Amino acid sequence: MDIIICKDEQEVGKAAAALIAPFATKGGTLGLATGSSPLSTYQELIRMYEAGEVSFKNCKAFLLDEYVGLTRDDENSYFKTIRKEFTDHIDIVDEEVYSPDGANPDPYEAAAEYEAKIAAESVDVQILGIGGNGHIAFNEPSSSLSGLTKVQALHPKTVEDNARFFNTIEEVPTHALTQGLGTLSRAQNIVLVATGEGKADAIRGTVEGPLTAMCPGSILQMHNNATIIVDEAAASKLENADHYRLMEQLKLR
């Protein structure tokens, strides 16, 4: 696990984009996350694309999750969100951006189909954010560390947190389709980004805590090619922060 500590959110985005861009140039398969954490990364990748520094035209992409009951074109779907925040602004083919089928009347069938589709590909680099409690995608604390794509009932706090994106809390879906931690772990490379003091406990648990289902992010300790990129605030509770800074300085380029 490599730990990169940056000055601020903008620098986090630049560092993450620098790792991801080579995979895009090679026409790789990308794993995309939504949420606030990867926004600066997407903004930097868009800038690089507009500057002619990277192309996504031969890439495929898989989203982490989707709400049960929402179509891809619903304004609150994660597929619609990733289009607005990222894929509409680059040259990736829209048909090569995949998400779980939230509109399938049988969500368990949708989960199995999405798991099979991901298994048939090799995700070259997976972009991740992390929740304040260490959750990855919709894998909340106590989720199986080897779990596959599944139907996940949303914690009431998650429903409450996501209500800001809907007109009323009653409109927030109560279930989601999400890649499991075992699914995510098959990615060849993982880049997790986190910013802000609110993520400091989760980053400490992910990097320095025990491997435990109570901190889903800790599964990255077992991955051969995981990079954690954080700003100073998110790194504020890391006991070995100075060591990580030194190791990054000494890394052979």
UniProtKB/Swiss-Prot annotation:
GO terms for biological process: carbohydrate metabolic process; glucosamine catabolic process; N-acetylglucosamine catabolic process; N-acetylneuraminate catabolic process. InterPro entries: Glc/Gal-6P_isomerase (IPR006148), Glucosamine6P_isomerase (IPR004547), NagB/RpiA_transferase-like (IPR037171). Its EC number is 3.5.99.6. Pathway: Amino-sugar metabolism; N-acetylneuraminate degradation; D-fructose 6-phosphate from N-acetylneuraminate: step 5/5. It catalyses: alpha-D-glucosamine 6-phosphate + H2O = beta-D-fructose 6-phosphate + NH4(+). One of its GO terms (cellular component) is cytoplasm. Keywords: Carbohydrate metabolism, Hydrolase. The active site is at 65 (proton acceptor), 133 (for ring-opening step), 135 (proton acceptor), 140 (for ring-opening step). It is an enzyme of class 3 (hydrolase). GO terms for molecular function: glucosamine-6-phosphate deaminase activity; identical protein binding. The keyword tRNA-binding does not apply. HAMAP family: GlcN6P_deamin. Belongs to the glucosamine/galactosamine-6-phosphate isomerase family. NagB subfamily. This is Glucosamine-6-phosphate deaminase. It comes from Corynebacterium glutamicum (strain ATCC 13032 / DSM 20300 / JCM 1318 / BCRC 11384 / CCUG 27702 / LMG 3730 / NBRC 12168 / NCIMB 10025 / NRRL B-2784 / 534). The gene is nagB.
